[in-house]
Amino acid sequence: MQSLGGIRSWPATWRTTTASMTTTTTESVRKVAQVLTVAGSDSGAGAGIQADIKVCAARGVYCASVKTAVKAKNTRAVQSVHLLPPDSVSEQLKSVLSDFEVDVVKTGMLPSPEIVEVLLQNLSEYPVRALVVDPVMVSTSGHVLAGSSILSIFRERLLPLADIITPNVKEASALLGGVRIQTVAEMRSAAKSLHQMGPRFVLVKGGDLPDSSDSVDVYFDGNEFHELHSPRIATRNTHGTGCTLASCIAAELAKGSNMLSAVKVAKRFVDSALNYSKDIVIGSGMQGPFDHFLSLKDPQSYRQSTFKPDDLFLYAVTDSRMNKKWNRSIVDAVKAAIEGGATIIQLREKEAETREFLEEAKSCVDICRSNGVCLLINDRFDIAIALDADGVHVGQSDMPVDLVRSLLGPDKIIGVSCKTQEQAHQAWKDGADYIGSGGVFPTNTKANNRTIGLDGLREVCKASKLPVVAIGGIGISNAESVMRIGEPNLKGVAVVSALFDQECVLTQAKKLHKTLTESKREH
């Protein structure tokens, strides 16, 4: 595989000294996470470098820009496209890269082989940590933005240098010579074929996939697939979704996230922005822009949209005794679980004093937030309030859900343990967000915990409108049998010892995620 200086030098889990925008190196010097976008200018400001700059600002990252083309565009149509001379693009690149400490370069519209060539030359001279390639050829609105003449240089020169590429299904098809991509299975096949062209990671976006009830993107790291699902949002304001997603990935990488976490944060950001902007009106055409600054204008709306039922897919419940047994901190355990594919974290602490637990939980909240993963506190709503955690999980003997809701407010996640149909009905009435049902199988994690079996789990699912996560004695050997019960509101499994009573949390999380993904695809 080719290399551009430092582009290939950073590991998948590379991190800066903090996950925030600025890192204090001395009392007077701060390092700022920096992205350079190399893309076209959009006069309507919904896509292109204008969108890239807004995204980076919203994510707390500095963004410089290099224009490759100037588009006259509004919500009705593209009126004209003017390509900048390669020399002009090269001068812009040298100007920025020779002065700024750019962490990540994100590319958008690269409209000619000559412009791709000057980009490659400058990156060879001025290496960066990561390269995010959004192969802009066909926009969300269907406009062709790059001709077939640059396909060969993309395949042969640019893609082998990319840390991640983010084509939509039309662009993926073009890169693969026009192959048919109309199903999730075909998206997975396309991602695998694109990976063979050299990028370290591939994200095939399925937002415009025909006959799909939800929005699904397929992520491939060369070994494992991750399907990222979210509900389709009915809105005309979808202009610039591809630019926004790729720029958000670049911003998160610049801050130090690993690739999968960056992708998850970016998808969540796009979904939240689309939902927040679904009713705004800018322009009179068929495809409007959306608002990238929702977290500043309406933080409540932004927080309310963070939890999705699919977050329950691989639910990791920590156990301090198990982590001590394997000589690791709760912080290291949470990091490894997330990197391995955990989609939500619950901190369960029964031994530590309040202050000790508070300090541990604060670090875990920061880790989860930087990786776009929700964190819940078991029982301790006081800790959840103090740290502004995403929510809590309570049992039947804990404070009632309706009272917890009155304390936490409407935007927090509340889960409740249920073993019976009656408890499941009550959880819905009291305003819970999800149900944890079990123990499905015998377990040593909780003393005197009654096992309900697969039939009991099925009854709880049938009795409730809420999403359900199964818990109790679940691991790699039996997770598939749990997911096979066929209830649509069963969204995942919660595990304790299957992750944390193991020598390597990362390895076990990856194996379990793979098992669940394959089970979901088969059923």
Swiss-Prot record:
Its EC number is 2.5.1.3, 2.7.1.49. Residues 1-38 form a transit peptide. GO terms for molecular function: ATP binding; hydroxymethylpyrimidine kinase activity; metal ion binding; phosphomethylpyrimidine kinase activity; thiamine-phosphate diphosphorylase activity. Keywords: ATP-binding, Chloroplast, Kinase, Magnesium, Metal-binding, Multifunctional enzyme, Nucleotide-binding, Plastid, Thiamine biosynthesis, Transferase, Transit peptide. 2-[(2R,5Z)-2-carboxy-4-methylthiazol-5(2H)-ylidene]ethyl phosphate binds at residues 443-445, 473, 496-497. Binds 1 Mg(2+) ion per subunit. It comes from the Eukaryota. Induction: Down-regulated by treatment with exogenous thiamine. Its main location: plastid. GO terms for cellular component: chloroplast. Pathway: Cofactor biosynthesis; thiamine diphosphate biosynthesis; thiamine phosphate from 4-amino-2-methyl-5-diphosphomethylpyrimidine and 4-methyl-5-(2-phosphoethyl)-thiazole: step 1/1; Cofactor biosynthesis; thiamine diphosphate biosynthesis; 4-amino-2-methyl-5-diphosphomethylpyrimidine from 5-amino-1-(5-phospho-D-ribosyl)imidazole: step 2/3. Essential for thiamine biosynthesis. Bifunctional enzyme that catalyzes the phosphorylation of hydroxymethylpyrimidine phosphate (HMP-P) to HMP-PP and condenses 4-methyl-5-(beta-hydroxyethyl)thiazole monophosphate (THZ-P) and 2-methyl-4-amino-5-hydroxymethyl pyrimidine pyrophosphate (HMP-PP) to form thiamine monophosphate (TMP). This is Thiamine biosynthetic bifunctional enzyme BTH1, chloroplastic. It comes from Brassica napus (Rape).
